[in-house]
Amino acid sequence: MPAPTIYVDADACPVKAEVEKVAERLGVVVTYVSNGGLRPSRDPMIRNVVVSKGADAADDWIVENAKSNDVVVTADIPLAARAVALGAHVLGPTGRPFTPETIGMAVAMRDLKQHLRETGESKGYNASFAPQDRSRFLGELDRILRRALKSATPG
């Protein structure tokens, strides 16, 4: 199995610096996928992919390129579900892992919240990103990447 790549749904991702920190320490390639606005990096281990402005263009690109054992970082639940189906390790920016066991409930909760917003039952409040989210993300990404690297090592 080849070494994992980290694919980041980069539009509005609050943990890019944390992704780079862990990836650099473990020697893993990072691919940021966005509709635009990415800063170029001099680091040869970081790739930027700019896709068209379509609603799911970045999501589609990630799903078309990610493979089993790669890592996908996203807050987008439908993308997380598609990546889990590929066999990728999926992590939200708050450090929440999405797995085959947890993705169904995440999709159901997303759909319920969307329905409540559409019917006016909810104002669409999302909790703000907190320092403990950043810390949890760092620890979880390190754990997931080490497991993916171990799976990629023959023997």
From Swiss-Prot:
Pfam families: DUF188. Signal peptide: none annotated. It comes from the Bacteria. Belongs to the UPF0178 family. This is UPF0178 protein mlr0875.
